[in-house]
């Protein structure tokens, strides 16, 4: 079964909000990956890059990690 994507071909709904949150907290992609690793999540800079550029789907664990790190709700992350 093929993986779902939006009518515009996007593979996730969080890329724009992830970029905005990362910039709001003055984090580079590498810095965000480092913070996530310190929190116990196995995400590197390449994962962040691929999510932000719509080249990758996002798992529920990754969404939880980002929500926890930025202290935002799931709904706020996918708006």
Model-derived regions: residue spans:
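Short alpha-helical DNA-recognition segment
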Residues: 27-50
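DNA major-groove recognition helix of helix-turn-helix/homeodomain DNA-binding modules
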Residues: 59-76
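Residues within the alpha-helical elements of helix-turn-helix
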Residues: 24, 35, 69
């Amino acid at each position: 079964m093929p993986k779902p994507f939006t009518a515009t071909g996007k593979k996730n709904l969080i890329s724009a909000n992830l970029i905005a949150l990362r910039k709001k907290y003055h984090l580079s992609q590498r810095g965000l990956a480092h913070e996530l690793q310190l929190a116990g999540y196995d995400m590197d800079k390449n994962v962040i890059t691929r999510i932000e550029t719509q080249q990758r789907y996002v798992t529920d664990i990754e969404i939880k990690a980002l929500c926890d790190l930025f202290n935002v709700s799931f709904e706020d992350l996918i708006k």
